[in-house]
Structures are given as structure tokens and as C-alpha cells.
């Protein structure tokens, strides 16, 4: 279980789509918004720590949906990488009732991230006729869960057969863990194939690359957020990639949070940025495979940092890359890029893209 402590939430600002600012420039409004977000995160983590203890601070991330309710006493945590759903409560009275409500709401919640505030304890989760987790979870009889009656029966089964407890030194934590189906990742990916194909045709970006980026960034979690306030399936930051894309489309300002939490808008914006990296920022790289490696790395760490691996002069950097084989470019970016995260990112996305190309 990932634990994000308050101090860890105040991260340095980089230059990328999923974690940083693009174009190597900063603006005052963006800095103010980022500082405000850091303050919000620090206060939110402090509130959690007051109830759960220092070692039990768990906050939503790119691949982790975490929602607190009951005045921070109950939380639902979906780990989209591991495929587990953990419902926990520290309620001192009727903990089973608190767990039951949270189990039912989590199983039946919709797929509209803009309607849910993951940074508060407000109970704003609504039951949907088309649950987001439908098909990704089955009950004790092996059936998918769409209706409240089946969710209620499954909750009762879980509380009777899988209820666990532990102490955090302050309170007793009661919990239930649900395993998602083995192919939960594919189930989620399938939801967005139509949107991916539309964006692929619109911007000329390979479907397999879009899917690989989505898997690596969010594990197809539409509720994805990050400590740098990257949002949605492709982890787009409003004031960086979002602003660049809007400018290229003749729009002023930056995309709103609700816009980027909309799956179709997020995929469109993220794909548009991939096209900008490929055609504009890194368009001087001739070999398409070498350019793809550079684009993938730049989506995480910024185009400027990619080129500086080869030369501080951008034109000279492209010229150097054009003298290298794609294999040498890959080797250089995965071993010499200054960011360990970006080095790993290229490996992860490239590996994921190969798997989607085989399908």
C-alpha cells in the first residue's frame, strides 16, 4: 500500500507532461496554483494523520484511488496496479456498518471523476447504473456487480468471511480486501478504445503508443491524480501540456480540471501533446524509431531534457541523434538521462507498447 506523507507531497517542479512544466518556461499563475495545491495537500495529509496516525497516511495517486468519508474515519482504496480494493474504517461504533456502506458505494460508483473530491472527506460518491468497476470485480458467486442488491449481498458476505482487524497504536482498523479479476487492466483499457482510436486518427499517433502511455501513467484509472497535480488517464498538467495544446489549437487559457477529468478530453489532449512532441519539439530527429524513443522520454521529462542528454544546443542534439542507430539512442536515454524516473519510463512505455502491437 502506497503511503504519501505530507512532506513528500511538496515535490520539485520538473519539465514534463505527467509531472512537469513544458517549454522550459514558468509563469506566475502556474507557480501560485502549484503552491496552493501543495498547501492543500499538506493540510489534507495532516487531517488524515490526526485520525489514522503518521504511518497510515494514504492519499490518491496516479494508480491509486483513495477516498475518505465519515469525517476521515472510513476510506476506500483501489490499487489499480495490484488489482486490489481495500475498504477500511477506524470508526469506534458500528464499524461493520461503516464498512458495508463504503463497500457498496465503491462497487457501484460511476466513472465521473469530476464529481468526486479525493482531497476531502465529503461523501460525494454516487451510485451509478453503469458502475465503473463493473466486470472488474465479481462477487462470491462469480457474478459481476451492477445492482445495489447484489452489491449489498456481497458486502454482507465479505463482512462475515473476510473481515480483518489490526491496531495502529491509536485505534483498531477494521478492513476488507477484494481482489479484482485477473484481466482487470484489459477490462479498463477496453472502455477507452473508441476514444483512443479517434484521437489516433485525429493526430496521427499510433494507438499502441497512446495505450502504452495510459497504462504507464495511470493504469487506466480515470480518477488519477498526482503530487504535481497531473490529472486523468494520461496525467496531463493544466498549466504545462494542457496550456501548450490549447495554444496550438488557438484557445486561450488552460484546460479546467473537469475538462481533464473527462476521459475523452484527457485522451485528446494527451495525444495532441504527443503529436506536438513528435512534429514540433522533436521534429528534427529523422529516424521514426529514434524519434519515438525521444517522444516517450519527453512525455515524462520534457523535450529539453531529452535533447540536453546529447548536446546543450538543440539543433546540434538532433544532428547527433541523427548519426546514431535507434538502438544507441534507446541505450543512451535509458542510461544517461539525468532523471532515473525518465530512464525507467522509456523502458516501461516501450515494453507496454510492444504488448499492444501484438494484439
Curated annotation (Swiss-Prot):
Residues covalently joined to lipid (S-diacylglycerol cysteine): 17
A single cellular component GO annotation: cell outer membrane
EC class name: lyase
Entry's Gene Ontology BP terms: cell wall macromolecule catabolic process; cell wall organization; peptidoglycan metabolic process
Bilayer topology term: Lipid-anchor
EC number in record: 4.2.2.n1
Chain's role: Murein-degrading enzyme. May play a role in recycling of muropeptides during cell elongation and/or cell division.
HAMAP family per UniProt: MltC
Protein name: Membrane-bound lytic murein transglycosylase C
Organism the protein comes from: Escherichia coli O7:K1 (strain IAI39 / ExPEC)
Amino acid at each position: 500500500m502506497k503511503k504519501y506523507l505530507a512532506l513528500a507531497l511538496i515535490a520539485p517542479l520538473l519539465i514534463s507532461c505527467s509531472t512537469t512544466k513544458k517549454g522550459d518556461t514558468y509563469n506566475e499563475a502556474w507557480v501560485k496554483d502549484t503552491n496552493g495545491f501543495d498547501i492543500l495537500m499538506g493540510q489534507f495529509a495532516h487531517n488524515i494523520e490526526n485520525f489514522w496516525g503518521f504511518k497510515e497516511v494514504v492519499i490518491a495517486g496516479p494508480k491509486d484511488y483513495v477516498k475518505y468519508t465519515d469525517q476521515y474515519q472510513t476510506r476506500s482504496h483501489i490499487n489499480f496496479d495490484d488489482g486490489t480494493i481495500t475498504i477500511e474504517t477506524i470508526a469506534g461504533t458500528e464499524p461493520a456498518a461503516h464498512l458495508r456502506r463504503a463497500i457498496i458505494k465503491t462497487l457501484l460508483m460511476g466513472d465521473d471523476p469530476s464529481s468526486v473530491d479525493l482531497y476531502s472527506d465529503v461523501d460525494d460518491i454516487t451510485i451509478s447504473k453503469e458502475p465503473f468497476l463493473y466486470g472488474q470485480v465479481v462477487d462470491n458467486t462469480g457474478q459481476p456487480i451492477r445492482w445495489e442488491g447484489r452489491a449489498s449481498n456481497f458486502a454482507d458476505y465479505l463482512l462475515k468471511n473476510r473481515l480483518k482487524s489490526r491496531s495502529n497504536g491509536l485505534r483498531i482498523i477494521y478492513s476488507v480486501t477484494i481482489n479484482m479479476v485477473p484481466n482487470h487492466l484489459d477490462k479498463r483499457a477496453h472502455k477507452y478504445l473508441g476514444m483512443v482510436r479517434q484521437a489516433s486518427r485525429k493526430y496521427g499517433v499510433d494507438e499502441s503508443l497512446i495505450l502504452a502511455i495510459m497504462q504507464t501513467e495511470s493504469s487506466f484509472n480515470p480518477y488519477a491524480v498526482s503530487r504535481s497535480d497531473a490529472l486523468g488517464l494520461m496525467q496531463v498538467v493544466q498549466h504545462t501540456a494542457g496550456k501548450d495544446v490549447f495554444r496550438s489549437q488557438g484557445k486561450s487559457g488552460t484546460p479546467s480540471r473537469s475538462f481533464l477529468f473527462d476521459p475523452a478530453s484527457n485522451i485528446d489532449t494527451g495525444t495532441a501533446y504527443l503529436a506536438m512532441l513528435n512534429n514540433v519539439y522533436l521534429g528534427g530527429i529523422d529516424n521514426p524509431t529514434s524519434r519515438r524513443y525521444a517522444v516517450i522520454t519527453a512525455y515524462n521529462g520534457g523535450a529539453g531534457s531529452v535533447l540536453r542528454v546529447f548536446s546543450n544546443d538543440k539543433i546540434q542534439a538532433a544532428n547527433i541523434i541523427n548519426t546514431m542507430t535507434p538502438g544507441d539512442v534507446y541505450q543512451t536515454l535509458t542510461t544517461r538521462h539525468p532523471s532515473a524516473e525518465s530512464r525507467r519510463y522509456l523502458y516501461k512505455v516501450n515494453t507496454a507498447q510492444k504488448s499492444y502491437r501484438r494484439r
